[in-house]
Amino acid sequence: MSETVPPAPAASAAPEKPLAGKKAKKPAKAAAASKKKPAGPSVSELIVQAASSSKERGGVSLAALKKALAAAGYDVEKNNSRIKLGIKSLVSKGTLVQTKGTGASGSFKLNKKASSVETKPGASKVATKTKATGASKKLKKATGASKKSVKTPKKAKKPAATRKSSKNPKKPKTVKPKKVAKSPAKAKAVKPKAAKARVTKPKTAKPKKAAPKKK
């Protein structure tokens, strides 16, 4: 009797496990990225808002800024160093003016000139874009006109015609002086004939008839 060999088991479920592990890592990265992004405005924006809302002439103190940030829902105790860094950066940029104290400690006031520039960034960008587009259109028109002006003189160049016109005026110059030289000789020969005719014909005096005497 012949012995039957059992078939080898197929490895089907083995490659599926690492794929499942890779898929599980992607949502974890997305969750970490979502945690890193802070919700709401940044520290510098909150400081600017607090300084603009205050009505004190001498400026807002650091304690007053911290109170305003805490009221807005910002964790002041954990982010104390960030608040100080934000104040220093705003002072260096010119958005805040330090009226009292040095460094992060003291009182600060909002710079009106810097705030007006920051509130209108879109308008300045639109103005610069319109100026750039207008200048580019003018440059395109100028380049098109220059190309046309360069092409036109090529058609106007005709060296053969200019050479022919320069040769033609030489011929009449040689012919004209001969005719002028002949005409005065004829006029001089005619004048002495008229003088001879006047000399050869002297006028003779006719005798007057005597009147008859009356009886």
UniProtKB/Swiss-Prot annotation:
Belongs to the histone H1/H5 family. InterPro entries: H1/H5, Histone_H1/H5_H15, WH-like_DNA-bd_sf, WH_DNA-bd_sf. This is Histone H1.1. It comes from the Eukaryota. It is found in: Nucleus; Chromosome. Histone H1 protein binds to linker DNA between nucleosomes forming the macromolecular structure known as the chromatin fiber. Histones H1 are necessary for the condensation of nucleosome chains into higher-order structured fibers. Also acts as a regulator of individual gene transcription through chromatin remodeling, nucleosome spacing and DNA methylation. GO terms for cellular component: cell surface; chromatin; euchromatin; nucleoplasm; nucleosome; nucleus; vesicle. The modification N6-(beta-hydroxybutyryl)lysine is found at K37, K55, K67, K88, K93, K109. Changing T152E: Significant destabilization of binding to chromatin. Gene3D superfamilies: Winged helix-like DNA-binding domain superfamily/Winged helix DNA-binding domain (1.10.10.10). GO terms for biological process: chromosome condensation; negative regulation of DNA recombination; nucleosome assembly; positive regulation of receptor-mediated endocytosis; spermatogenesis. Residues 39-112 form the H15 domain. H1 histones are progressively phosphorylated during the cell cycle, becoming maximally phosphorylated during late G2 phase and M phase, and being dephosphorylated sharply thereafter. It comes from Homo sapiens (Human). It holds the Pfam family Linker_histone. Its main location: nucleus. The modification Phosphoserine is found at S2, S12, S44, S107. Residues 122-147 have a biased composition (Low complexity).
